[in-house]
From Swiss-Prot:
GO MF assignments: glycogen phosphorylase activity; nucleotide binding; pyridoxal phosphate binding
Protein name listed in UniProt: Glycogen phosphorylase, liver form
Residue numbers binding AMP: 43-45, 76, 310
SUPFAM superfamilies: UDP-Glycosyltransferase/glycogen phosphorylase (SSF53756)
Record comment: activity regulation: Allosterically regulated through the non-covalent binding of metabolites, being activated by AMP and inhibited by ATP, ADP, and glucose-6-phosphate. The activity is also controlled by post-translational modifications including phosphorylation and acetylation.
Gene field: PYGL
Record's function text: Allosteric enzyme that catalyzes the rate-limiting step in glycogen catabolism, the phosphorolytic cleavage of glycogen to produce glucose-1-phosphate, and plays a central role in maintaining cellular and organismal glucose homeostasis.
InterPro entries, sorted: Glycg_phsphrylas, Glyco_trans_35
Keywords: Acetylation, Allosteric enzyme, Carbohydrate metabolism, Cytoplasm, Glycogen metabolism, Glycosyltransferase, Nucleotide-binding, Phosphoprotein, Pyridoxal phosphate, Transferase
């Protein structure tokens, strides 16, 4: 008789081995059927297209999960250094197609769905965008997660699971109206709630100093409930985790007072605690010092650091060691990247944990903290820098304020010793600003508390070092680095432009997807007329497809053989959508003046959201829609010129418009755009760039040759010289008749006949307080646009320039960026090991990893 199994042997039957599904068309169809009937409880008679989308998403997810579990088991076995990317924004967009591509399932899924008589594209369009970001900063975080997984780094994205993401933009009567983005209303098939890892986060209260140490007591507690989303690498079986925290009230919330009496009200008040993760603040490059926002920033930081320390202890904490010696290994096991200053409170929070809870001496705690953190700066605009009122922090986080004061005191002592007579330097470098309302400068806190600080393009990093944080870089020059941004070629080429991706693969093979520098091989086809024509054909197909989309969704008919001239990004004065608009008015006036003259037809497309409280940005949208109303309905203009405002620009819309673009507008005032990443997406997708020498445009020109971009306007030093001399907008207005005409038309109500003074504030701003000097670059911009039109009339020369740009875009892969972060900042090595899906290690992995 067989010996009975021990409990341990019985447990071994609970295993992922043997249940990881086969990945072929028949199995995918089976999975689809199973999920439609057993997960969604529908049959084909009552299933809606949304049910079919969910059935497909769950089927694809099944193939993710095996890899996800194996990846976490692998990390537990190998115990690699882990990197934690802390960001208040992750602008992920849609997940289905990206997952199919990264798992190598797209063809099989396409075939399975086709065999089931369904339309794959229709199903993909049902998915909601995960719009948990405003623009570039959040989308960068998403691209970085893709690259970290593709490079086999043990990486975790940590953020907030906002119930409402970036608002949906509606245009009514030419004005922006915001609507709530209830992206979770149908459920989210990709996330997994992890209530077993729920953690407490404390607010308010008071600080008590005793002989045993310092305690933060009488606090209000909010619980942080984690939701995990898998992040697959490209064809390497690595699946990392993005963990987003949702706020929950504890069960005894407002009921702790025995005589509270009003039980119903106490339950209703739970909403107040849960509001922390309710909505994303819709500000891009603008600081709004609201208590709820500060709560969000501390909430993500406090929950994340508890999680990081729990995982560190589960993997490496040897109980025979004292906490002090055990934590010596912390920076060897943990790197934390702060995506802008939003998670800056992680620095005092880690100090609080080390000093108050783990009882480390201050100097040891500070040494470990500095070695752990690194900070990425994303903007040089003064209005975007976070400066929290001391009073607000004192009320919400009293212990953290004490720690910040202590950090500042030691920091200033060090500076005073180095520069004994320089009192003004102390003022400039302090973490606390004393003028007016006392404030904490969060960028200064990040710099002092990190071992590395980086800008996001060469020119931006130079400005950071020589202007914005000059004193700090003089003190510690080696702390400051550059890491030029990048984009993931999986989403921004394979997914959004399969025609171009295949064409490239036919010429140079498929390896470029993981090593984008191989695109330089395309230079050997510059003389290949057939290839140039094929590239042009792909662009034409994309334009046709986008024209049909515009007609269907926006009821706008456009000429698909016109030049598609596109500016899509957040609406902000520094991005100068106004300059673009003035050019449209100028083109319109030229056509009206001489209708018989040859004119290269253009469709100008402008899209982007304005922060709800940003009056000038909203007025700019109204101007664009008003100009469009006149231009598009003038029979004399016909199909020569059209202006479209692209409503509700978001990741999934970017995936449609970018591959269809001929001309990419990157026209910020030199020295204002830190990097930009839209510029890179357009370049990779075969658009030519008209732009200033700003942000990553500078490096794009370096890579492709300045003669292969349409560069115009003031350089950084010209802007500085003009500031010194004094910018007089009137001088340009008087000297340039076409500019004068355009401004007069806007001012006198030509584009707003029912309300002639509608744009007076805008015109007034352009004349008297335009920090971004639109008029100063107008003439150069219009002349440069004439060069663009000329080249467009010579398709072969245009296509050669397009190919040169695609071939030069390899530097701008986020894989390259992440390799540089890993090497220079995190001290980590990418791994090209493909994790085996069959084996399984001994237990304990999930205990340590909490996935």
């Amino acid at each position: 008789m067989a010996k009975p199994l021990t409990d341990q042997e019985k447990r071994r039957q609970i295993s992922i081995r043997g249940i990881v599904g086969v990945e072929n068309v028949a199995e995918l169809k089976k999975g689809f059927n199973r999920h439609l009937h057993f997960t969604l409880v529908k049959d084909r008679n009552v299933a809606t297209p949304r049910d079919y989308f969910f059935a497909l998403a769950h089927t694809v997810r099944d193939h993710l999960v095996g890899r996800w579990i194996r990846t976490q088991q692998y990390y537990y076995e190998k115990c690699p250094k882990r990197v934690y990317y802390l960001s208040l924004e992750f602008y992920m967009g849609r997940t289905l197609q990206n997952t199919m591509i990264n798992l190598g399932l797209q063809n099989a899924c396409d075939e399975a769905i086709y065999q089931l008589g369904l339309d794959m594209e229709e199903l993909e369009e049902i998915e909601e965008d995960a719009g948990l970001g405003n623009g570039g900063l959040g989308r960068l975080a998403a691209c970085f997660l893709d690259s970290m997984a593709t490079l086999g780094l043990a990486a975790y994205g940590y953020g907030i699971r906002y119930e409402y993401g970036i608002f949906n933009q509606k245009i009514r009567d030419g004005w922006q109206i915001e609507e709530a983005d209830d992206w979770l209303r149908h459920g989210n098939p990709w996330e997994k709630a992890r209530p077993e890892f729920m953690l407490p986060v404390h607010f308010y209260g008071r600080v008590e100093h005793t002989e045993a140490g310092t305690k933060w007591i009488d606090t209000q507690v909010v619980l942080a409930l984690p939701y995990d989303t898998p992040v697959p690498g490209y064809l390497n079986n690595t699946v990392n985790t993005m963990r987003l925290w949702s706020a929950r009230a504890p069960n005894d919330f407002n009921l702790r007072d025995f005589n509270v009496g009003d039980y119903i009200q106490a339950v209703l008040d739970r909403n107040l605690a849960e509001n922390i993760s309710r909505v994303l603040y819709p500000n891009d490059n603008f600081f709004e010092g609201k208590e709820l926002r500060l709560k969000q920033e501390y909430f993500v930081v406090a929950a994340t650091l508890q999680d990081v320390i729990r995982r560190f202890k589960a993997s490496k904490f040897d109980s025979s060691n004292s906490a002090e010696t055990a934590f010596d290994a912390f920076p060897d096991q943990v790197a934390i990247q702060l995506n802008d200053t939003h998670p800056a409170l992680a620095i005092p929070e880690l100090m609080r944990i080390f000093v108050d809870i783990e009882k480390l001496p201050w100097s040891k705690a500070w040494e470990i903290t500095q070695k752990t953190f690194a900070y990425t700066n994303h903007t040089v605009l003064p209005e975007a820098l976070e400066r929290w009122p001391v009073e607000l922090v004192e009320n919400l986080l009293p212990r953290h304020l004490q720690i910040i004061y202590e950090i500042n005191q030691k920091h200033l002592d060090k500076i005073a010793a180095l520069f004994p007579k320089d009192v003004d330097r102390l003022r400039r470098m302090s973490l606390i600003e004393e003028e007016g309302v006392k404030r904490i400068n969060m960028a200064h806190l990040c710099i002092v508390g990190s071992h590395a600080v980086n800008g996001v393009a060469k020119i931006h990093s130079d400005i950071v070092k020589t202007q914005v944080f000059k004193d700090f870089s003089e003190l510690e020059p080696d702390k400051f680095q550059n890491k030029t941004n990048g984009i993931t070629p999986r989403r921004w080429l394979l997914l959004c432009n399969p025609g171009l991706a295949e064409l490239i693969a036919e010429k140079i093979g498929e390896d470029y997807v993981k090593d984008l520098s191989q695109l330089t091989k395309l230079n050997s086809f510059l003389g290949d007329d057939i290839f140039l024509r094929e590239i042009s054909n792909v662009k034409q197909e994309n334009k046709l497809k986008f024209s049909q989309f515009l007609e269907k969704e926006y009821k706008v008919k456009i000429n698909p053989s016109s030049m598609f001239d596109v500016q899509v990004k957040r609406i902000h004065e520094y991005k100068r959508q106004l300059l673009n608009c003035l050019h449209v008015v100028t083109m319109y006036n030229r056509i009206k003046k001489d209708p018989k003259k040859l004119f290269v037809p253009r469709t100008v497309i402008i899209g982007g959201k304005a922060a709800p409280g940003y009056y000038m940005a909203k007025l700019i949208i109204k101007l664009i829609t008003s100009v469009a109303e006149v231009v598009n309905n003038d029979p004399m203009v016909g199909s020569k010129l059209k202006l479209i405002f692209l409503e509700n620009y978001r990741v999934s819309l970017a995936e449609k418009v970018i591959p269809a673009t001929d001309l990419s507008e990157q026209i910020s005032t030199a020295g204002t755009e830190a990097s930009g990443t839209g510029n890179m997406k357009f370049m990779q997708n075969g658009a030519l760039t008209i732009g200033t020498m700003d942000g990553a445009n500078v490096e794009m020109a370096e890579e492709a040759g300045e003669e292969n971009l349409f560069i115009f306007g003031m350089r950084v030093e010209d802007v500085a010289a003009l500031d010194k001399k004094g910018y007089e907008a009137k001088e340009y207005y008087e000297a340039l008749p076409e500019l004068k005409l355009a401004i007069d038309q806007i001012d006198k109500g030509f584009f707003s006949p029912k309300q002639p003074d509608l744009f007076k504030d805008l015109v007034n701003m352009l004349f008297y307080h335009d920090r971004f000097k639109v008029f100063a670059d107008y003439e150069a911009y219009v002349k440069c646009q004439e060069k663009v039109s000329q080249l467009y009339m010579n398709p072969k020369a245009w296509n050669i320039m397009v190919l040169k740009n695609i071939a030069a875009s390899g530097k701008f892969s986020s894989d390259r960026t992440i390799k540089e972060y890993a090497r220079d900042i995190w001290n980590m090595e990418p791994s090209d090991i493909k994790i085996s899906l069959s084996g399984e290690p001994s237990g304990g992995a999930n205990k340590a990893n909490g996935k």
